[in-house]
Regions:
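Glycine-rich, aromatic-bearing surface loops/beta-hairpins
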Residues: 120-156
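A structured, charge-rich N-terminal accessory region that forms the first stable segment of a protein
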Residues: 3-4, 8-11, 87-107, 115-127, ...
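Alpha-helix capping and helix-coil boundary motifs
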Residues: 31, 60, 80, 88, ...
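Short, surface-exposed acidic
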Residues: 30-37, 75-80, 108-111
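Long, compositionally biased
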Residues: 53-89
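Generic structural signal of hydrophobic/aromatic residues within well-ordered alpha-helices
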Residues: 20-21, 44, 48, 64-68, ...
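N-terminal interaction modules that seed assembly of large macromolecular complexes
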Residues: 7-67
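Amphipathic alpha-helical interaction surfaces
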Residues: 45, 67-78, 99-106
Length: 156
């Protein structure tokens, strides 16, 4: 499968989205499902999905969160960032989703239609210490189930 960008940028992309999720929740006080909805409908999600180097590698997660929220509100937003000593569940989810989006070439919006952000976040306790391929396998399974359910509904 052709990927939107080289794996040389993948770690940067994962850190950027992870930091964006973390900043949205802990600096900007968004609930993750709300931020994810805003992000997945933003031009920044599309740029991320297509490998825009400025978005995936050229800025921090905090900067991405500021731009996504700013675009949504129609004004610039800046707050003193709150840094967590440990990697939060939100950070992990951003990190894992960036990898999965790159791996699957599935849009962030489509991913949210397959499984809710709340359910993805609930995967943290089981998957955060596993190799990322375990998360990929589970997401692939959920995608297949979703596609099969859709086909079943259409055939009824």
């Amino acid at each position: 499968m052709k990927r939107a960008y080289s794996d040389l940028y993948l770690r940067d992309a994962m850190r950027t989205l992870a930091g964006s999720f973390d900043a949205a929740v802990y600096t900007y006080d968004y609930e993750l499902p709300e931020y994810y909805r805003i992000f997945s409908n933003s031009t920044f999600a599309m740029k991320f999905e297509t490998g825009d180097p400025f978005v995936i590698s050229g800025e921090s997660g905090i900067e991405l969160a500021e731009k996504v929220i700013g675009q949504h509100l129609g004004e610039d937003v800046h707050k003193q960032p709150i840094f967590n000593d440990d990697k939060t569940p939100e950070y992990w989810l951003g990190w894992a989703l960036a990898y999965y989006q790159w791996h699957s070439a599935c849009s962030f919006k489509t991913l949210a239609e397959i499984i809710s952000v709340e359910n993805m976040l609930n995967m943290y306790s089981k998957y955060h210490q596993m190799d990322i391929t375990q998360f990929v396998d589970r997401m692939d399974e959920l995608r297949r189930t979703s596609i099969n359910n859709t086909k079943s509904i259409l055939n009824d």
